[in-house]
Amino acid sequence: MSNEAKCPFNHTAGSGTTNQDWWPKRLRLELLSQHSAKTNPLDPDFDYAKAFNSLDLAAVKQDLAKLMTDSQDWWPADFGHYGPLFIRMAWHSAGTYRVGDGRGGAGRGQQRFAPLNSWPDNVSLDKARRLLWPIKKKYGNKISWADLFILTGNVALETMGFKTFGFGGGREDTWEPDQDVYWGDEKTWLGGDLRYGKNEAQPVADKAGHGKEHGRTDGGRNLENPLAAVQMGLIYVNPEGPDGNPDPQASAHDIRETFARMAMNDEETVALIAGGHTFGKTHGAGPADNVGPEPEAAELENQGLGWKNSFGTGKGSDTITSGLEVTWTSTPTKWSNNFFWNLFGYEWELTKSPAGAHQWIPKHGAGAGSVPDAHDPSKRHVPSMLTSDIALRVDPAYEKIARRFFENPDEFADAFARAWFKLTHRDMGPRVRYLGPEVPAEDLIWQDPIPKVNHPLVDDQDVAALKQKVLASGLSVSELVSTAWASASTFRGSDKRGGANGARIRLAPQKDWAVNQPEQLAKVLKVLEGIQADFNGKQSGGKKVSLADLIVLAGCAAIEQAAGQAGHKVTVPFTAGRMDASQEQTDVASFAPLEPVHDGFRNFLKSRYDVPAEHLLIDRAQLLTLTAPEMTVLIGGLRVLDVHTDKEKHGVFTDRPGVLTNDFFRNLIDMGTEWKPSSPARESFTGHDRKTGKQKWTASRVDLVFGSNSQLRALSEVYASDDAQDKFVRDFIAAWTKVMNLDRFDLK
């Protein structure tokens, strides 16, 4: 026997006990380096917008329309039409979005990857994606998977007689699973005990509807934020009822909370459920124990397909997906009002599917023979409903809307078209990001509209003059930088909302957020508005400076002054072109979830949380699309610029506040300082001179983690070095400029 045979490889790179195994509460800095160029197979200069705009979208749609009725033997189409399957694919791609943190949604094509590709609620969607491959192959990189999923859903609707509201492209694919999305703590599929077992305080929607988009609603179940789905591996609610209990009224409570957390009101919710369930069927031909492992657990020879079904033929009439066997309407491949006709036209009783799942059929055998079979023309069935469908009849608010839609089919069609468009585009950000010839002309309030630039912009000479005015206004460096940061740092890379453009910091609700220090904010805005009015009043030819631009420019001017006082003559990049939104263009309830209830960059915590502040900082930095070095240099710069929200001035490790130095890092890692907790919860600390015992500094957990965590300390050492001052200033300005321009999609 050879030596090679005697000494086989038992382990490979990355195997063995990991740091995460040893220290499960470690700071996950890798969340700040996701989706890097190293994972992207496309050329560095690939421009997706340019590629998509070169696409013949009509030709793509024509090919998709042909696919709808091109039934394949390996996965036959129900009723001879793949439309319902593709609607479900698009719906489930977009439906993971939640307004609480903006994560999830269709924007990255994440349905291709774990865990979503293997969620119990996504059974058989692996087949839908394989059916699409010939079209993706044909058009290649001109259309992303993310865009193709949603476009296919639209074409599915259109080929079944429905007029959609429009389509916007622009979703760029990623090439690895998202690691930052919190799907829940449950360790078993369809588990829901932990997301309802946490007693955190959450806002309850008031009568005006404020809070409905991200808080809990009445019903006694306290769903953990930011989750929207009721169970691990579901997109929305359990169709059988809460935890499988077939109680339509209780189901209505879950529906209202879940859809609200997806930014949908009651009318949009009814339209989406009824509109989606106008088409197709569910699948529960036999017991679930006939279904094999999900794609991520399947054998190599299955080539990424999962849920191999041993019941009968394993496909067609023998398909098992949800375990429910429901066909809602008599025309499952045609747009109609038949869902409501059946919902209100029959009295319903509980039954079970062949797989043993709870579902509903008309009482006394009514409706027999009115529903076609999906694969055998000689067979007919009774209509059937899910518990979550019956909820639309028993809940008073839903019932009122549903009857109105039943009696006004054109209104229903319009409501569904708009709700479907919102569902599939909610995570794309402002309308300026949409691509293609089918983008609707109408501005919608949930798109956070901002007026287009309609006047000449300030030039370099104007910028210099405005900087002088700002610096002579009596406002401090801290006040100017704080205001600019507050305006820009609402941005979320998850759903592309927030940011400095629009100057919504002067409007409700942002002007009243605790993190923005409303009194100081009002003072700064009053001065800046005066400078704006004076400048605009003296211009000819319609030239103006928006308040949105002036807020950012003022922050840049303050940083230049702070760097100058440290001996560095710098120019902070500034590009005009922001506009000011109005209060009428700002949905207060919709913006409420953007409130930073924690912001480590300003040492702010609205209340105490179970999650340590340093972990919340990583969450905030990830939403701001920052890398670990960018986060680090921003913290160090903002601290010495005296940007904070606490009276204790935690983390201001300098005797020259307002001057852009690397003092934060030098003093943090100085071994002459000994740190001690100053609160029982170890949320604040004091730094003492090791020799004299004299107190030198105070700090938060966020401050000290840059000296405690090994990776962050390594970064801090770079900026604390004697030769690092120039680099620190350069890197801070670069990271600052990035944040100020995160929502400047016109520059990208």
From Swiss-Prot:
Gene3D superfamilies, A to Z: 1.10.520.10, Peroxidase, domain 2
Cofactor note: Binds 1 heme b (iron(II)-protoporphyrin IX) group per dimer.
Residues noted as binding heme b in the record, renumbered to the chain: H277
InterPro entries hit by this protein: Catalase_peroxidase, Haem_peroxidase, Haem_peroxidase_sf, Peroxidases_AS, Peroxidases_heam-ligand_BS
Molecular function GO labels: catalase activity; heme binding; metal ion binding
PROSITE patterns with a match to the protein in the record: PEROXIDASE_1, PEROXIDASE_2, PEROXIDASE_4
Chain spans, region Disordered: 201-223
Cofactor: heme b
Reaction(s) catalysed (UniProt annotation): H2O2 + AH2 = A + 2 H2O; 2 H2O2 = O2 + 2 H2O
GO cellular component: cytosol
Matching HAMAP family: Catal_peroxid (MF_01961)
Function: Bifunctional enzyme with both catalase and broad-spectrum peroxidase activity.
Family that this chain belongs to: Belongs to the peroxidase family. Peroxidase/catalase subfamily.
Subunit structure: Homodimer or homotetramer.
Protein name per UniProt: Catalase-peroxidase
Source organism: Bordetella avium (strain 197N)
